[in-house]
Each structure stands twice: as C-alpha cells, then as structure tokens.
Amino acid sequence: KNNKTNTQLKIDGYYEQNKNLYFNNLTILENKNNIKLRKLILSENNSINNIDYAEFDYLDTEKKLNKYSIKKIKKNNFNLNGLNFNANSLISNLLNSNDKKRKNIFQNNIVLNINLNEVFLDETNYISDLKGNLFINDNSVIDANLTALFDNKNNISFTINRDTDNNKITTLYSSRAKPLVERYKFIKGFDEGYLDFYSSKKDNISKSKLNIYDFKLKELPVLTKILTLASLQGIADILSGEGIRFDEF
C-alpha cells in the first residue's frame, strides 16, 4: 500500500466462532487498483476452503500491470484467465522456499486451468500465451502441463506427472535459457542457449539431469575460474529444491 493514497475496504461477511470466516463480497480499492472477491471461505487455520470468483486489476511494486481473474467452474475446479501477470516474485519465492515449510494455502485439492496472455518472468523477460493446467494435492503440485511462447520461434514447457513405476517425473524445456539462468548471480554475462531439465523422484530420492546447449558466457566470478560441475550443481539444486547430480552440460 502507498501511504499517500486512500484505500477503501468493503466487506460483506460473517464469522462462525472456531469455524470458518465467510466473505460474501470483499472489495479493496486504491486509486486505479482494485481487488474483488466473491464467496470466499477461510478455514480456522486461514487456508482457502472456497472461492467462487476473484478479480485482480492492479499495478504492483515493480510497476507491472496485473490483470487476471479466478473463477470456479465446478467444485474444486477453477479457471485462471487474464491479460497480464507478473510472476517474478512468485518464481523467486518458489526457488527459495523450503518444501518442509510449505504453507497450507488450500484446504482442498484443486484443479487450476490457466490461460494468460502475458506473464513476466523478471523485470525484462516475459512469455506469451501461457496455457495449461495444474493439479494441486495437499498443497503440492502433483500433475502439471504448461506451455508458453517467447516469440513465434521460441517456446517454454513445464510438466509434472507419474510414470508406470509411480516415479514423479518433472520436465522443463526452454528454448531461451537466459531468463532462467541469469537469476543466479554467480554466472555473469550468460547469453543465448536453450535449457532442458528432467527429474525423476520416488520415495524422496531424486535423480535429475540438466542440459544447457549453445550458450555464450562473457564473464566468470573470481571464485570460479572455470565452469565447474560444482557450479552446475548449484543451478540444479535451486531448480529442483534438493541435491541432485549432473549428467551433462
């Protein structure tokens, strides 16, 4: 919130002691920024038990426009549609999060169908036409299929699923590696190249492979005179959130 602006908060709801908090309608207005929620139910531990509709239209702290909506189409099944979404802080939080400390945002398992015109990955890089779906079970994504475009020739895709042996398979392909790699400051001047990541996990044991092809590197930090496997391991650790081994670079 900007301390120099007036904020209006409109609430229509009620609270059941030691049970749920019900919002029939909740509206937050600040200049041209507005957030509208309908039929929002929060459980006793503040996790989301239900929401029928949510609309977001605001300029965030990075001066990026966010304009999207979430609509329930049937029980625990939602559509996320919109023109603009800034995912920069979300990506940073995911990369820095500890899975053991995962927050219980949702009370129930949900399906999220996504259709966003433009999504910013950081301050300058963005993707277009992000489409796909996520299946969230116990506040963890157990199934995913997302695709998007950098432009007409470059694309990015992300999947999570299970194979016949019940291994959790995660894949990430990006025909532009730079927007993902340059988040890690120990590598300087990274340019071009494409990225291919594969991970198989079962019983909390993960085997992963990260390939980055056809890239250019202008500068290395003093402590890494050559591009070592230790440095590569660092990228993979951040991508997966756990220790993994490199097969190829």
Model-derived segments and spans:
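Membrane-proximal interfacial segments on either side of biological membranes
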Residues: 1-249
